[in-house]
Amino acid sequence: MTAQTAEEHSLTAVIGLEVHVQLETDTKIFCGCSTDADDNEEPNTRTCPVCLGLPGALPVLNEGAVEAAVKVGKALSSDIPEETRFHRKNYYYPDLPKNFQITQYDAPICDGGELEFAVDDERRTVAIERAHLEEDPGSLSHAGGSIDTAEHTLVDYNRAGTPLLEIVTAPDFRSAAEVRAFLAKLTEVLEYLGVFDVTRDGSLRVDANLSIVDSDAVGENGSIDEATLEAANRTEVKNISSHKGAEKALAYEETRQKNAVQRGREVEQETRHWDESRGITVSMRSKEEEKDYRYFREADIPPLRVSDWKEKIDIPELPDARRERFREEYGLDAETASKLTSTKQVADFYERVADTFAPELAATWVADNLLGELNYRDMEITDIEGRLDEFAHLIELVDEDEITVKNAEEVVLRRMLDDGQPPGDIVEAEDLGKTDDDAVAAAVTAAIEENPDAVEDYHAGEDGALNFLVGQVMQETGGSADPGTVNELLRAELDG
């Protein structure tokens, strides 16, 4: 694209993704080494001759990895072929002990598919080109700086051989924000399927291909013809490990390329590294083409007939379907249903609570009160899964009018999360049981007698006066009176 063209027309980003998902299996994809990583483990201790690529070591395919891949394919509406095969992808890099990677080439385990998601309240659908199984390389630690400034680099092969599913999208994204929304939705689906651990470091990594085209080449539905795509030089951005990181990296790269085009410079076709600490991409190497990898069949792994058992693999209810069911079955609004299905653990927790209490009451407590307090403490629902009975008891105390909603929210729930105490003990220790009617009535009378100015303001029509008097009663009763009852008693006495 010439500088003149760039000045006359706006520019549009074209983005495609390669999403690498670490599958949740007990052992690596081609050997019996554990995948259970420990933050304190020594480097190069979860290895064997197979994952180190030593001569004579033969790979054995992990059935669990295949099952997980089939589940993902079904969730993405992919075609699961009758037969799938493995190939060797040849390249030289320090984290690849064999100097080739066992992956899939012309017969991936998942072919085609799509994923629908929302961005800025607009529904988008991105096509999935394929998803294939492969082994994860080792990991590199760049000492003394980032990849382009490090004094030296250390290699750890503990990760080598961890099962990966690489999900390749069509170049259907037109902004970094769309990419972030897509990754959030994909993560949600994968978590519901139970095929990966979202809390594990590096469990989802992204390589993104980005190029810039003239906006006039983009059709009304966002389509771009093949010739335009082929003519545009693209960069591959690596080292993206989060949804937020993907948005930041691609926003930077889009700006960098647009600036280059607008200044009449050619965009180099290269591989770039996202340096999160500096917020920039840096050049790594010229971008390889498919022919550079010299793919050939992996002779040590025979073709796999997935058709023999793929129909036996079921997938659970997915987030969109569960969201819709919550709205229909429990009468929830869209926002609340979305909160309650944000993760499978939250949805499961809510349904167990809703089995005991009115669904609307359970929804309010889980979606608004509990999730809000957990988020404030940087906790997850999984941190309290074993305390479901205690949480149910708290709702029961409110439902049976034994404590006020205010005390339940602001005292009991917070102490439960901070100190680990059961609700009954907190109520007893803090004397939070509801004040009896006579005591509330006495506190109402005292508030009126002791605050004549507020009474005068109330009769003058000032709205804040009643709230002040309610506050005085609540203070007198230690917050154990019901605010609604106090309000009614005050109005009755003031208006009588």
Swiss-Prot record:
Q: What EC number is given for this enzyme?
A: 6.3.5.-
Q: Is Plastid found in the keyword set?
A: no
Which Gene3D superfamilies would you find in this protein's record?
1.10.10.410, GatB domain, N-terminal subdomain
Keywords tagged on the record = ATP-binding, Ligase, Nucleotide-binding, Protein biosynthesis
Which transformation does this protein catalyse, written as a reaction?
L-glutamyl-tRNA(Gln) + L-glutamine + ATP + H2O = L-glutaminyl-tRNA(Gln) + L-glutamate + ADP + phosphate + H(+); L-aspartyl-tRNA(Asn) + L-glutamine + ATP + H2O = L-asparaginyl-tRNA(Asn) + L-glutamate + ADP + phosphate + 2 H(+)
Its top-level enzyme class, in one word, is ligase
Question: Which GO terms of type biological process are on file?
Answer: glutaminyl-tRNAGln biosynthesis via transamidation; translation
GO MF entries: asparaginyl-tRNA synthase (glutamine-hydrolyzing) activity; ATP binding; glutaminyl-tRNA synthase (glutamine-hydrolyzing) activity
Query: One Pfam family, short name please?
Result: GatB_N
The record's listing under InterPro entries reads: Asn/Gln-tRNA_amidoTrfase_suB/E (IPR017959), Asn/Gln-tRNA_Trfase_suB/E_cat (IPR006075), Asn/Gln_amidotransferase (IPR018027), Asn/Gln_tRNA_amidoTrase-B-like (IPR003789), GatB (IPR004413), GatB_C_1 (IPR042114), GatB_Yqey_C_2 (IPR023168), Gln-tRNA_amidoTrfase_suB_CS (IPR017958)
Organism domain of life: Archaea
- Described purpose of this protein according to its UniProt entry: Allows the formation of correctly charged Asn-tRNA(Asn) or Gln-tRNA(Gln) through the transamidation of misacylated Asp-tRNA(Asn) or Glu-tRNA(Gln) in organisms which lack either or both of asparaginyl-tRNA or glutaminyl-tRNA synthetases. The reaction takes place in the presence of glutamine and ATP through an activated phospho-Asp-tRNA(Asn) or phospho-Glu-tRNA(Gln).
Q: How does it assemble?
A: Heterotrimer of A, B and C subunits.
Protein family = Belongs to the GatB/GatE family. GatB subfamily.
Recorded protein name is: Aspartyl/glutamyl-tRNA(Asn/Gln) amidotransferase subunit B
